[in-house]
């Protein structure tokens, strides 16, 4: 089993995450967008010249995409809309990639749903 998957398996519960601390401003982050529903900030380990994480401010049991329920439809759509807004703000007119890693095999590292916005270079396919 890969070390990434082992690390993910240790964090499967709904306990507070580093993102909760970022939302509460208990630890620093480079915020690029914020409103009453979401927070977007630069990834501390970027995988592209532009790598931004977009998270809902209220987790509401939405630790990952597999946990989504009908009540989460609005926030899931809003996360994608904000990805578009931030991409434009970041000057990614030529294109960008939006990623949601889900679960241990999907290499999800923080169990608070989040969207990765990647751009600023040519994205390759397949991704991984």
UniProtKB/Swiss-Prot annotation:
Residue positions of motif Histidine triad motif: 112-116
Gene Ontology MF: a single term: adenylylsulfatase activity
Protein name: 14 kDa zinc-binding protein
GO cellular component assignments: cytoplasm
Species of provenance: Zea mays
Assembly, per entry: Homodimer.
Example GO biological process: sulfur compound metabolic process
Record InterPro entries: Histidine_triad_CS, Histidine_triad_HIT, HIT-like, HIT-like_sf
HIT domain residues: 18-128
Top-rank taxon, per record: Eukaryota
């Amino acid at each position: 089993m890969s070390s990434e998957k082992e690390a993910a398996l240790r964090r499967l519960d709904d306990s507070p995450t580093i993102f909760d601390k970022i939302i509460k401003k208990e630890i620093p982050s480079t915020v690029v967008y914020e409103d009453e529903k979401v927070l977007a900030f630069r990834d501390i380990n970027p995988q592209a010249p532009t790598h931004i994480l977009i998270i809902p401010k209220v987790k509401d049991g939405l630790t990952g995409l597999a946990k989504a329920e009908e009540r989460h439809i609005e926030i899931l759509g809003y996360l994608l809309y904000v990805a578009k807004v931030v991409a434009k703000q970041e000057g990614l007119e030529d294109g960008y990639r939006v990623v949601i890693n889900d679960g241990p095999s999907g290499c999800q590292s923080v169990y608070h749903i989040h969207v990765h916005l990647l751009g600023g270079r040519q994205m390759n396919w397949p991704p991984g």
